[in-house]
């Protein structure tokens, strides 16, 4: 069981900022920006390469919800970045697909 499943089951506390039937968003405990939220499906999708065509609707709704989450957290106007890390070289540390929403400061390009 991943840490995200434990958070979804309320076995581990988290600052949840948004929740729907099949995904939720919470503040990252090790933020990399003033606003750093993880948007996570409640069921495990083991990384982006573990997604299947049937996941498209869920993943699309997670992306669409990011604009509401950004608005709620006060970064919709100034701007925010969405990131999906996939694999060790990208920094993926939990084998459960999730989207990082980062904002509250200027983001450099290229990242990393």
Predicted regions and their residues:
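HIT superfamily nucleotide-processing domains
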Residues: 1-112
